[in-house]
C-alpha cells in the first residue's frame, strides 16, 4: 500500500469500480455472427438502396469468398487488405476474411498511392479483396473481386477448406493510426478483445436485434467496427448509404431506411436538423470534443449518449447514460469493456485521486495486442502494470498490459469520467495555460456560428497568435485565396466582429483571438472529424494581411512608421521578410498580438532608439497604436523628459463619485438582525478558484459552512468540476457547495438581476477575494473587475437584510495614512484599482457602523502569500518566487538589503484570518494587516541550507547583473514580465521601511514554509 498515494477512501472507490476486471469473452467475431445467421436467417442484416442482404445471404456469400481466400493461403494471422467505396460488399468482405481465419485492414481508395503502398508493405499483403473500379491500384497483387452482381448468385453454406480453426487470441482486424514519424501505425486487435468489449458496449449503447444502425463512418475509421461488427453480433440491421447518399442525402437516407441508431461526430451533427429526422432514437456523439450546443440541441429529441474510445482498446472505452440538457459536454460516462485509471502524465506509477486531472490509462480484456512490427511504439504505449496495481492483480504471473491514451481526463465521485483534452492541446499565453476547447465552446454558442476552430499556429505569419476560423450560417465575403476552393479562408467581416464582441463578454481578454477568418466548409477527415491539420496548413500558408480600416501611418511620422515596422517585425517568424504593404499600417497593438511580454521588449526598443521610457501600460491600452505611442514619445521629447508621464486619471474624483452612489444605497439599506441563522445561510465567495481562493474555500467547507462560489464557466456542472479536481476535495463537501455562474468583468457580475435578488436572501457573509492581477495594464483595463465588481458587491450586501459580514481582500502597494495618500502613491493600474476599491469598502464600513446597520465590514491585507510548510504549494508567477529563482540562477544577491523585511504569510494563516472576520463580532479595526515577515537574509539562509551557493554583492553590482541577465534572456527571463515592478522596487525584494515584527516561533514556521515552497518549485522545474 505504500505505493498508493491517493486517500484511502478514493482507493476503495477505485477497487469498487475497477475490480474485478470485466471477463474475457473467449469467442471469435464470426462465430457470434454465424449464430445470428442460424437463429434468424431471413432477417435483413444489411439494408441499402443498392441491395439488401439477409443474415442467411450474408453468411452464405461470406462463406463462398472465405473458401477462395483459404485456397489463396489465408489463415490465422494473415492480413487481408479490403478496398471498397461505400457498399454492402465491404461488409461481406469483412466477414469473409474473418471466416477464413485472417485479419482484415481497410484501405481508402481515395488515399494517396504512397500511403496505400506503405500499408500494403507493412502488413505484408499478398492478396486484396476489392471491386472492379479499384483493381488498378493493386496490379502487383492477387485480387478477389466482389460486386453487387455476386449478391444474385446462389450462396453456399459448404464448409471451407480445412485449416487451423480460428482462436479467440488470433488477430481479427487492424486499424491504422497516424504516427509521429510520418509512418502510420497499425493497431492489431484480437477477436477476444473486441468480443469482450462488445459484450459490454453494445447494451450500454442500446444496440440490440431491433437496432437499425447507420453505417456512417469511413471504413478506415474505428467507429465503423461498432457500426458493422457490433450490429451483426447483436442481430441488428446495418443501414449502409452510398458515398453520394452519405454526403448529399443523409437525412433522406435515414428517414427512408428507418434508421434508429447512429454514432456521429459532434462537428458533423451540427449540419443536421433533428426536426427533419423522424426515426432516430439513439445518437452517440464520439470522436471529437462534444459541444454544449450539441447537447442542448439534441438531448430533448433523442436518447443522446456521449462516448470515448481509442482504436488500441477495441474502439469503445466509456459510454454515458442518456443526457439531459444540463449534462456537461465533457462527460464521457462509465467504462464499458475495460476499466480506466487516472495517472500522472509524466509518471504512470503515480495514481491520481478522484477529481484530479491526469492521463487516462486503460486496463482489461479490450486492450489490443499492440502495433504491428513496431515494438518500440508498442512498449511506449502498452505498459506493464504500475507499482500501485501490483498487489491487486488477479494473476500476477500473467498480468495484462495497460494502454496509455495520451488523453487527459478525471474521475467523478460517482465513478463516471470527464474528458478534459488531448495532452498537448493546452497552449500557454502570457504564462497562462489556456484550453482552446473552452474558447471554441463559447464561440460555438453564438447563433451565427455553425462550428468553429481556434488554433495557435506554430509556423507562418500568424505563429503564436490565437486564430479563430468559423463556419457560419451566413455566407463569407472576400476570399483570400483564388476562389477555386470552398475551404479558402476569408477575411473577417461584420459578422465576425459581432462574434468577437460576444466572446469578450464570456472570456478574459487574453483568450480572445487576435485574428478571425471564415470558411465556407471545414475540411473533414474520412472519419467526419474536422481536419485540424488541414486548417493549420491553410493558416500557415496565409501571408499576414492588414485591415485597411486601420489606416497607414503618415509618411512624415518617422517615429510612428518605425514603431509600426517594429510591431510588424515582432509578429513575424524570425527571418521572415516584411511585406511592404503592411509594414506601416496603424494597427492597434493588441490586434497585432502585442501582449505584456512583447510590450516590455517594445518599450526597451523605443528607449534605445529615442531615449524615452514609455510605461508598459501605454502599450496595453485598448486604443494603443503606432501613431499614439509616437505621440507619447514626442510629448516626452518636447518636455525634455526621458520618460512619458501618463496623464493621471482623476482617481479622487472617481472615488468621491462612487462614495456618493454608495451613500444613496446606505440610506435605504435595511437594519440587520444580530440573530444567528443557524448555518442555513451561505457565504458568497469570489475568486474561489484562485490560489488563495481555494484555501479560503477549503477552510470554509472544513468548518462546515455552506458556500456559494461565483465561477466563470460554461455551465454549473463544469463549474463544480473545477473544485472536484482539487486534491483536498471530499465527497461530503458536495452538499455544502453551490456554484453561481458569473463574471466579475461583466455588469452586475454577469448575473441576472432576479437571481441576484434571490441570492440576497441566502447569503450571510460576502468574501470578495476575486481580482484581476496584472502589473502592466492600466487602471481603465482593470476597472471593471477590480472596482465595478466591488461596488456591485457592496450594493448587494447593503441591500440584503441577511448579509451581516463583508470581507474584502486587498492588495497593491503599502498603505499610507489616508485614502488620498494611497491613491497618490500608487504607480501601477493594479495598485490604483485595488486601493480605490479598498477605500470604498472602508468608507462603507465606517458609515455602516455610524448608521448601525448591523453590517460588519473589514479589509484583510496580506503581503506575499506562500504555501504552508505541510504542502508547500507555491505560486510560481508571484514576484517573490521569480526574484528568488533569479537569485538562484545568478548565484548572487544584494547585500545592501539583507535587513530589509519581506512581508510574507502562508495560505492557511491568511485563510484563517479571513474566516475570523466573518466569525467574530464587528470591531472598529476595519483594516486587518497580516503582519508576518522575514528579513531577506532569512530567505538566503534557507537557500544555503538547501545547498545553493550564494555570494553577496553590492547593490550596484546586483542591479547590473540582473539587468544584463534580463537583456540576454529577454522574454525567457523569470522577471521579464514584471520588469516594471522590479524597477519600481529599485531591484529589491524587501523594504527596510517595513516595521512588521515576527516572533521566533513564527519566524521558524515561515522559514520552514519557505523551504518547503522552494523544494516544491524545484520539483516542478521552476527553480
Swiss-Prot record:
Keywords of this entry: Ligase, Oxidoreductase, Phosphopantetheine, Phosphoprotein
Pathway(s) served: Secondary metabolite biosynthesis
Presence of the UniProt keyword Ligase in the record: yes
Ranges for domain Thioester reductase (TE): 685-901
Cofactors named for this entry: pantetheine 4'-phosphate
An example molecular function term from Gene Ontology annotations: oxidoreductase activity
Chain segments carrying region Adenylation: 54-454
EC number: 1.-.-.-, 6.3.2.-
Family: Belongs to the NRP synthetase family.
Name recorded for this polypeptide: NRPS-like oxidoreductase fscA
Amino acid at each position: 500500500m505504500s505505493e498508493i498515494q491517493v486517500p484511502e477512501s478514493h482507493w476503495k472507490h477505485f477497487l469498487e469500480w475497477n475490480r474485478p476486471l470485466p471477463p474475457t469473452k473467449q469467442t471469435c467475431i464470426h462465430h457470434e455472427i454465424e449464430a445470428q445467421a442460424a437463429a434468424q436467417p431471413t432477417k435483413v442484416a444489411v439494408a441499402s438502396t443498392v441491395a439488401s442482404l439477409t443474415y442467411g445471404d450474408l453468411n452464405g456469400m461470406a462463406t463462398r469468398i472465405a473458401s477462395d481466400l483459404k485456397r489463396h493461403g489465408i489463415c490465422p494471422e494473415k492480413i487481408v487488405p479490403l478496398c471498397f467505396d461505400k457498399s454492402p460488399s465491404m461488409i461481406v468482405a469483412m466477414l469473409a476474411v474473418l471466416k477464413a481465419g485472417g485479419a482484415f485492414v481497410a484501405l481508402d481508395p481515395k488515399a494517396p498511392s504512397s500511403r496505400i503502398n506503405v500499408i500494403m508493405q507493412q502488413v505484408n499483403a499478398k492478396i486484396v479483396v476489392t471491386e472492379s473500379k479499384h483493381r488498378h491500384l493493386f496490379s502487383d497483387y492477387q485480387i478477389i473481386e466482389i460486386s453487387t452482381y455476386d449478391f444474385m448468385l446462389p450462396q453456399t453454406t459448404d464448409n471451407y477448406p480445412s485449416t487451423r480453426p480460428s482462436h479467440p487470441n488470433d488477430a481479427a482486424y487492424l486499424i491504422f493510426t497516424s504516427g509521429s514519424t510520418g509512418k502510420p501505425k497499425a493497431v492489431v486487435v484480437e477477436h477476444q478483445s473486441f468480443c469482450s468489449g462488445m459484450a459490454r458496449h453494445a447494451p450500454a449503447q442500446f444496440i440490440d436485434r431491433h437496432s437499425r444502425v447507420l453505417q456512417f463512418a469511413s471504413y478506415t475509421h474505428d467507429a465503423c467496427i461498432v457500426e458493422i461488427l457490433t450490429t451483426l453480433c447483436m442481430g441488428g440491421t446495418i443501414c449502409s448509404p452510398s458515398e453520394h447518399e452519405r454526403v448529399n442525402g443523409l437525412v433522406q437516407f435515414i428517414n427512408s431506411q428507418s434508421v434508429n441508431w447512429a454514432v456521429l461526430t459532434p462537428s458533423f451533427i451540427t449540419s443536421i436538423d433533428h426536426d427533419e429526422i423522424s426515426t432516430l432514437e439513439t445518437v452517440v456523439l464520439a470522436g471529437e470534443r462534444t459541444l454544449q450546443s450539441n447537447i442542448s440541441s439534441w438531448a430533448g429529441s433523442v436518447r443522446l449518449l456521449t462516448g470515448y474510445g481509442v482504436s488500441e482498446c477495441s474502439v469503445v472505452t466509456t459510454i454515458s447514460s442518456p443526457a439531459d440538457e444540463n449534462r456537461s459536454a465533457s462527460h464521457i460516462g462509465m467504462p464499458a469493456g475495460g476499466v480506466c485509471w487516472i495517472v500522472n502524465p509524466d509518471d504512470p506509477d503515480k495514481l491520481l485521486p478522484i477529481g484530479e486531472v491526469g492521463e487516462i490509462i486503460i486496463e482489461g480484456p479490450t486492450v489490443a495486442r499492440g502495433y504491428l512490427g513496431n515494438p518500440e511504439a508498442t512498449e511506449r504505449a502498452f505498459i506493464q502494470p504500475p507499482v500501485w496495481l501490483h498487489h491487486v492483480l488477479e494473476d500476477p504471473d500473467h498480468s495484462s498490459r495497460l494502454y496509455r491514451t495520451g488523453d487527459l481526463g478525471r474521475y467523478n465521485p460517482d465513478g463516471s469520467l470527464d474528458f478534459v483534452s488531448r495532452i498537448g492541446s493546452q497552449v500557454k499565453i502570457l504564462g497562462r495555460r489556456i484550453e482552446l476547447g473552452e474558447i471554441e465552446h463559447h464561440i460555438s454558442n453564438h447563433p451565427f456560428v455553425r462550428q468553429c476552430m481556434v488554433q495557435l499556429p506554430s509556423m507562418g505569419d500568424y505563429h503564436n497568435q490565437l486564430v479563430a476560423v468559423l463556419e457560419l450560417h451566413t455566407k463569407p465575403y472576400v476570399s483570400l485565396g483564388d476562389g477555386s476552393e470552398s475551404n479558402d479562408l476569408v477575411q473577417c467581416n461584420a459578422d465576425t466582429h459581432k462574434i468577437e464582441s460576444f466572446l469578450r463578454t464570456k472570456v478574459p481578454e487574453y483568450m480572445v483571438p487576435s485574428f478571425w477568418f471564415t470558411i465556407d466548409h471545414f475540411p473533414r477527415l474520412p472519419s467526419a472529424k474536422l481536419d485540424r491539420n488541414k486548417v493549420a496548413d491553410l493558416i500557415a500558408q496565409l501571408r499576414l494581411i492588414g485591415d485597411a480600416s486601420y489606416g497607414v501611418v503618415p509618411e512624415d511620422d518617422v517615429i510612428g512608421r518605425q514603431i509600426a515596422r517594429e510591431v510588424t517585425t515582432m509578429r513575424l517568424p524570425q527571418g521572415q521578410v516584411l511585406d511592404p504593404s503592411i509594414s506601416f499600417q496603424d494597427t492597434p497593438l493588441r490586434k497585432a498580438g502585442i501582449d505584456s511580454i512583447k510590450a516590455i521588449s517594445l518599450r526597451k526598443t523605443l528607449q534605445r532608439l529615442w531615449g524615452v521610457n514609455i510605461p508598459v501600460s501605454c502599450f496595453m491600452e485598448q486604443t494603443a497604436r503606432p501613431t499614439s505611442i509616437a505621440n507619447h514619445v514626442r510629448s516626452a521629447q518636447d518636455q525634455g523628459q526621458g520618460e512619458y508621464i501618463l496623464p493621471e486619471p482623476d482617481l479622487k474624483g472617481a472615488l468621491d463619485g462612487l462614495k456618493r452612489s454608495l451613500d444613496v444605497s446606505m440610506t435605504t439599506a435595511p437594519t440587520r438582525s444580530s440573530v444567528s441563522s443557524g448555518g442555513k445561510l451561505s457565504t458568497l465567495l469570489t475568486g474561489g478558484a484562485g490560489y488563495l481562493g481555494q484555501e479560503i474555500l477549503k477552510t470554509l467547507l472544513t468548518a462546515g459552512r455552506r458556500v456559494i462560489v461565483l465561477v466563470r464557466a460554461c455551465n454549473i456542472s463544469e463549474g463544480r468540476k473545477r473544485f472536484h479536481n482539487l486534491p483536498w476535495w471530499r465527497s461530503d463537501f458536495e452538499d455544502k457547495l453551490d456554484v453561481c455562474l458569473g463574471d466579475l468583468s461583466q455588469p452586475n457580475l454577469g448575473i441576472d438581476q432576479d437571481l441576484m435578488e434571490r441570492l440576497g436572501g441566502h447569503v450571510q457573509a460576502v468574501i470578495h477575494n476575486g481580482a484581476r492581477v496584472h502589473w502592466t495594464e492600466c487602471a481603465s483595463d482593470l476597472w471593471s473587475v477590480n472596482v465595478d465588481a466591488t461596488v456591485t458587491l457592496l450594493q448587494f450586501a447593503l441591500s440584503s437584510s441577511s448579509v451581516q459580514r463583508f470581507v474584502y481582500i486587498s492588495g497593491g502597494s503599502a498603505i499610507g495614512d489616508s485614502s488620498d495618500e494611497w491613491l497618490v502613491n500608487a504607480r501601477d493600474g493594479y495598485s490604483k484599482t485595488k486601493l480605490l476599491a479598498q477605500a470604498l469598502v472602508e468608507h462603507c464600513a465606517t458609515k455602516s457602523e455610524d448608521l448601525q446597520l448591523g453590517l460588519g465590514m473589514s479589509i484583510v491585507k496580506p503581503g506575499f502569500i506562500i504555501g504552508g510548510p505541510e504542502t508547500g504549494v507555491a505560486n510560481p508567477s508571484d514576484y517573490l518566487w521569480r526574484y528568488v529563482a533569479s537569485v538562484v540562477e545568478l548565484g548572487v544577491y544584494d547585500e545592501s538589503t539583507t535587513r530589509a523585511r519581506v512581508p510574507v504569510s502562508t495560505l492557511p494563516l491568511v485563510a484563517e484570518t479571513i474566516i475570523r472576520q466573518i466569525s467574530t463580532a464587528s470591531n472598529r479595526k476595519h483594516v486587518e494587516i497580516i503582519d508576518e515577515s522575514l528579513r531577506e537574509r532569512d530567505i538566503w539562509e534557507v537557500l544555503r541550507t538547501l545547498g545553493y551557493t550564494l555570494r553577496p554583492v553590492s547593490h550596484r553590482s546586483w542591479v547590473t547583473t540582473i539587468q544584463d541577465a534580463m537583456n540576454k534572456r529577454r522574454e525567457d527571463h523569470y522577471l521579464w514580465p514584471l520588469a516594471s515592478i522590479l524597477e519600481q522596487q529599485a531591484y529589491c525584494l524587501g523594504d527596510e521601511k517595513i516595521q512588521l515584527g515576527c516572533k521566533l516561533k513564527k519566524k521558524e514556521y515561515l522559514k520552514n514554509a519557505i523551504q518547503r515552497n522552494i523544494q516544491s518549485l524545484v520539483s516542478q522545474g521552476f527553480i
